[in-house]
């Protein structure tokens, strides 16, 4: 991975707009969430570098959807693809809120549908609930 995709350490004078936005976004989180979102953003930055894109400026919804497709082509399950996009979508959302980009390219990006297996959901029926109360 080249230095263009490095998110940390914090060196504002030598960081790109995308790196500063990533550090700003990640500063909101701690622990496992910070670690997970850092990983997700490193993956996004690496994909952008391989694709010749800036990871923040000039990104369009089509780029985000191509990335989503590439995650599926790597063999990730639909639920994992959706999970991998949490950090990336948050990154764009906060970059837009902070005025770094004029629009959020990920807001309308189509994610895979994830079906919950209702048969595995445990719950009480009406009579069990009445007895419980």
Model regions: which residues?
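N-terminal core-binding DNA-recognition domain of tyrosine recombinases/integrases
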Residues: 19-35, 42-120
């Amino acid at each position: 991975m080249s230095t263009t995709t490095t998110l940390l350490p914090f060196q504002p004078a030598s960081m790109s707009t995308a790196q500063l936005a990533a550090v700003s976004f990640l500063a909101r989180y701690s622990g496992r969430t910070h670690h997970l979102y850092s990983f997700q953003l490193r993956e996004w930055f690496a994909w952008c570098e391989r694709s010749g894109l800036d990871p923040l400026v000039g990104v369009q919804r089509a780029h985000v959807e191509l990335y989503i497709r590439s995650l599926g082509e790597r063999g990730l399950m639909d639920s994992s693809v959706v999970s991998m996009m949490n950090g990336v979508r948050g990154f764009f959302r906060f970059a837009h809120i902070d005025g770094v980009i004029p629009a959020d390219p990920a807001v309308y990006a189509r994610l895979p549908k994830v079906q919950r297996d209702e048969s595995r959901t445990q719950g009480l029926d009406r009579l069990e609930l009445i007895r419980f109360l």
